[in-house]
Structures are given as C-alpha cells and as structure tokens.
Amino acid sequence: MGQAPKRLPLSGSEPKFTQKMWGRAVGINNNNCYAYAVGDYEKKRSYKSVPGERAGIKNMNHSYLSCMKLPQRVIADNPKRVYMAKAEEKCKPGHYKVMMFIAPGKPTNYFRQGDFHFYKQVNEVEYKVKKGNTHESIAGFFKVPLTRVKKAMPKLVAGKIMRFKANIFSHKRGWATGPLVTDAKGKVIVDPRKASRDYPGLNYKKYCSSFCVKNKGIKVGHTHSKVGKKA
C-alpha cells in the first residue's frame, strides 16, 4: 500500500462538508467557488463573485493569466477577516484554510482568458451512503481509519447520512455543481496542491496563495455593500 497522504493542520474552526443549502438548486445557481470557499451563501446573485469586487477596486478587469494582485484583492474584500498564510500553517482559532489557484487559459487568435478557483478545508463530512458501499470502501475513499467509519454508522443503510471527521478539502465548480470533495480524477482532495485540477478547457495548474478565513461574517461579490477601502 502507498503512503497515506499528509493532512494539513486544523484550527478546530473548519466548516462541515454538507450538501444542505449549497447542494440545492438555489445554492448551486447563485454561489460560485469564491462564495462557497468563504461561506457567503446567497439565494440570488446576478453574476458570479470575483476577488476585489466588494473592495470597490476601480479596475476590476483581470485576465487571471497570473496571480498578480489576486491575493491582495481577496484580503481587500474582507480586511481583518482574511489573512495570507502558508499552506502548512495552522490558522488562528476562529479561522480555516482556503487555497486559490488560477487556470492561465489557452491562447487563441484573438484573446487569452484564464479563470480562478478556490478550495476550502473541511473536517467533519456528511456522506450519503450509496448502494454497494462498505465500511472498507468508504474508509479507503476518504483515506481515514476503518474504525472511524464503523463508529459513525455500524450498520450501513443506503440513502442515510453518516458523519465523521476526514480533514479534507472541498470546492464548488462555479454555478455548475454543488459542493465536491473530489478532484478532476474523482479522488478525494487531501491537499489541493497535489490534487488533479485539470478540467476540460480549464487547467488550474498555478497555485497562488493560501489564506486563513474567519469562519463567519465573510461577504463577497456585488450583493453586499462595498468595503470602501481600495486595494
């Protein structure tokens, strides 16, 4: 067997992975990866949230071909509630880890446009048992001890929700999906930097930064009042 992947440190303030709200039609269609990563759920958004918008940055145009000034824009959206950190660093109490990547895009005859993507660290996982699941298959998929899975639900029942701690990362692919814990190859995400991020048309191959985000009160996008501080 291969070596178990190294988990990144927890602060104890990580959100739970759940499909509630975020995985329903309203949650899927109005909350992109940025909003999901920072926990800013909204029932109605006219367009997707982008870093720096809430900060009121004058020139919002960004090609996302590089990470230039993107981390600063994220911080400017929620000053004093978000700070940059190393990926291996433990966040302060009341904060959790978020990572940002970009897909530089592919050159065309006319333009080149990239994209950004965010992942957030979660600890407790709500998992809906599927037909054919075994304790061994669930433990193997999430890369957690078998005893932990058996304790969470001694007798597996398809369709029921089980809860256990996994210390993994979750993300949401724009307005196209609900919350996910799998990468582009369908594997559970223990560390986004080591996960597959190559999707058809978008390869989020460039790691920009890690942040520690306060676990409540974060707002992004056009649906909230401006911070009033330019970055």
Q: What is the predicted function of each stretch?
A:
Residues K131-N133, R148-F164:
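Short acidic, glycine/serine/threonine-rich helix-capping segments at coil-helix boundaries
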Residues V125-P145:
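Primarily a LysM-type cell-wall glycan-binding module
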Residues C33, C67, Q113-D115, T134-S137, ...:
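Short, charged amphipathic recognition helices of the HTH superfamily
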Residues G2-R81:
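Cysteine-nucleophile protease catalytic domains, especially the papain-like/related folds used
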Residues A158-A231:
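Active-site or metal-binding loop neighborhoods of secreted/extracellular toxin and effector enzymes
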Residues G2-A4, Y64, G114, K219-K230:
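Extended terminal accessory/targeting regions
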Residues H62-V125, A166-A176:
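...with weaker cross-activation on analogous glycine-rich loops/strands in unrelated enzymes
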